[in-house]
Amino acid sequence: MMRRAASQTVASLRGYASPVNPALRLPVVASLISPGRFASSAAASPLVCRDAIVKAVTAKAVFDEKIVESLANTFVNGLEKSSYPLNFSQEEMVAHVQGLLTAEARFRMGDSFEYVHENRRNAFYICRNEPQKKLRMLRKMAQFVSRNEDPKLGSNTHHYVSEDRNFAIYTASIEPFIENTNTEMHVDPENPALPTQTAERQLTERQKEIVRGLLHRQLSSVFPVFHIEEVSKGQVSFTMATMLERTNYVTWLLSIFQEIAGAEVMTGVSYSFANRVQIYGFEIRGAAAEQIAERASLVGLLPSRPFNALTRLHEAGALSCEETVFIDAAVIFAMYFTPSPTTDDYRHLKAILATEPNGVNRLNNLRSSLTQEVMSERYTGAVIALYPEFVKLIYEDFRLGSKPERRAAIAEKIMHRLREDDRAEYDRTLFMSFLKFNEVIIKHNFCKTEKAALAFRLNPEFLKELEFPRVPHGVFLFAGGQWRGFHIRFTDIARGGVRMIISKERNYRKNKRSVFQENYNLAYTQLLKNKDIPEGGSKGTILISSSYLNKFDEVRCRHIFLQYVDAMLDLIIPGEKGVVDRLKAEEIIFLGPDENTAGTFPAAGALYSKGRGYKAWKSFTTGKDPELGGIPHDVYGMTTHSVRAYVRCIYEKLGLRESEMRKFQTGGPDGDLGSNEVLRSKEKMVGMVDISASLHDPQGIDREELARLAHHRLPLREFRRSKLSPEGFLVLTEDRNVKLPDGTLVEDGSRMRDEFHFLKYSDADVFVPCGGRPRSVTLENVGKFLKVPDADGESMMEGKYANLSPEQLKFTIIVEGANLFISQDARVALEKCGVTLIKDASANKGGVTSSSLEVFAGLCLSDEEHAKYMSAKSATDAPEFYKRYVQEILQRIEENAKLEFNAIWREWEKDPNQPKTLIADALSRKNVQMRANVLSSDIFQNRDLVRYVMDQYALKTLKEVVPVDVMLERVPKNYQHAICAMWLASRYVYQTGVDSNEFDFFRYMTEVYANAAKSAK
């Protein structure tokens, strides 16, 4: 399908309307490099005063005049036919000749022929015209311009090869952008593309026209866009625009062009613009436009780390750019799915520890920690560097479409060689993982010319071999230039957010190792949580390289999010050109907001998918702006509404008054859950912590001040200290050596923040986690939640502290708003000590309920109806339909929460020794299994039943606009079936409990069929 920009329909986002046709005659026009093209005679360029250059260099009395004259002539003769004389002053040329003389002197003394000169704003490099020498200098130049972090300054680079092909020179400069003027260059007036002073001076009108076109296309593109023109027979001009990265692309571009047999890069330039776009221009001899386009599309996907083994192999020519990009993705796969080394000792210990609580889990944790270095990507790269020929075989198998016979032959060849070389068993396992990658890929976009990231749809059955408790329905692996990601869903129709993980350097390695496991856990939790909606559980993750970004940057993060979206769309839009598809089935994906992907991101994703021509764009993302039909969770407190329903149900059962309870909360007033928990609760807040600060007041934190912060979404650091009682305190994360009112010295504010939920200042009746990293409380540290000396998680699990009084508990009630804040075993340990605990999958499902009903409206309403009824400027300025629909969603959230809570409580009253956590899991598992059974049955042949359930499920306000019979025509059949399966399963399980049997289900369905028949009359 032809790609369209998110803001408007365009034929293509590249420099030509479609992939280049070999028969297409390219016009002979001006290139970006020179005012016309490489001139055929010196007449096209101003005369260079050789005598003046010789005189100026000789005057420095460093080199003999004859040598100066000889090399000056060599220099001028080599470059005077290029645009070099146009771009440099006489003084600069003198410096360059001086550099050439220095390089020659080094060479005559037995050193390498090269010269490097750098100061604060300018740099000059010279070397032999040899691939490795040029790459070395290019890397230095790229590092030089990448050091500039001043947003008011831009960079320029120039690259020339002498006419006799003997030497190459590189120059770089850092300088201000021009003042803002009303020129046609500014395709986006709100963010003008101001060029550097050098670019403004050097670019001709034709070149500016090319640049304007690229800048315009870059506005709606999430990958590099380029323009290719033939400037003369056998000579091609290549111009590319991309979002400004921390590392300059010029090295990678040169390296991939050098792969083309007979091709030579003659000149190159790059200019940065004030709107964070970088322009690159190259003039290449001996290459066809098709060859250049093919390779240029991969430039943003090459490994970007200078000392990465794959980068070195590519630059040395041992691997092509296609092989390098492919094996980089295969290494990502291998990192997460290569089985951990096992030995007889491991198997023996596993058998012994199998009878101990949590024993095998602890053994596996120990194995993981001991094998981290061996299973690292660095080690994998080192092994690949020894056997690049294996990569070529594995890539060829992938390129041709992997076949079992070919994989077996390759595996035999690899195993034979590695045994000969006496390599470790793990090395053999690594290469087998690469072949496994080929085997499990059932859809990919590797062959697409236009792609923001690599996307692979994997057959998830291979996870059975890796001891995952449940095999997902679908797994996607994504490999971007500066990020990697996954998407996991446990059912065909599934829902979940996309989490963007941004790390400091010290945490990046840990996050990199755990990202798939975290994604899996979050998706599985979502599956259990989504028992009240048609969609099963899913989750997406985007892990950004810490060397690229270590804190949230909205522009860059949105750009990466849209790259993730673009790659996903490649695989779910039917009939996409260049996509290799062995799945042969249409998939529906729903993406919700999560950490670092809320705000404007969902709307951007929806509009982008609309621009790509995705029919279900209205439902593709949730959490969109109200103007696009989104129902923002934070504005209406959807998730909090569910959490509060559970808290109040507990108070009602235990006979407690909300206003008399003391509460502690993680997650501050600047977040969705944190702010709404503040605004919608009535307890006395005694402690709160967020990323910015730790706050405590035993008299109760001032409610009005908390409300002020929550309304304005401000972090705790903005809390006015004047609102604290004498015993209260506010410690900022960056504070050091702070003395608290009770005399305690806090040496490190960030450490206090991380441990605050364990300190005495957070003691309360109720704990509601509304933020924090997963597994903040585990079996290893949960003992700190007891006011008992030396309490530990293992003893808690064994029931040693089963008869504690409420005074011995740090918290008597815990309702998890944040996902996975407390590990499963820690939850059970707390309940065995008398804590009333409701886990995340039950408590915080309000958000997904809202998102699901938002999606359902998008599927039911036509585009015109959607714009009329679901487009709201704000919560107050919204259509009456929208307001009523939101209120009905809130009622549905509360209804679902009470249904599940009462089911959990009834089961617990039957056996008070059974943890509510395990009861909730049992109910969820039964629900999920019942849903799967219904989906695999022929129950949907009864159209009266389907119509009845759809009528029960749809909210009244929606049915007033779209009658049920119209819904049945518009909503996809598999989504209708998912609604029926969910509705039947959840109500059955909530009514009959964990121990119900087939006879109970028969009675239940008899009643449902009777109601359906009655409704059909």
Task: List where the protein language model places each region.
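Hydrophobic, well-ordered beta-alpha structural blocks that scaffold small-molecule cofactor pockets
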Residues: 617, 627-706
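Gly-rich Lys/Arg/Thr-decorated short loops/hinges at beta-loop-alpha junctions or inter-strand turns
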Residues: 234-236, 496-503, 616-632, 720-739, ...
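Non-catalytic interaction/regulatory segments
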Residues: 25-33, 42-481, 486, 501-512, ...
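Glycine/serine-rich phosphate-binding loop and adjoining beta1-alpha1 elements at the start
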Residues: 485, 519-659
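Conserved phosphate/anionic-ligand binding catalytic regions in large, soluble enzymes, centered on
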Residues: 468-496, 527-552, 591-600, 625-643, ...
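Non-transmembrane, aqueous-exposed alpha-helical and coiled segments at domain scale
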Residues: 550, 648-662, 679, 697-711, ...
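N-terminal mitochondrial targeting presequence
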Residues: 1-44
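Terminal amphipathic helices with adjacent charged low-complexity linkers/tails
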Residues: 280-283, 551, 555-558, 584-585, ...
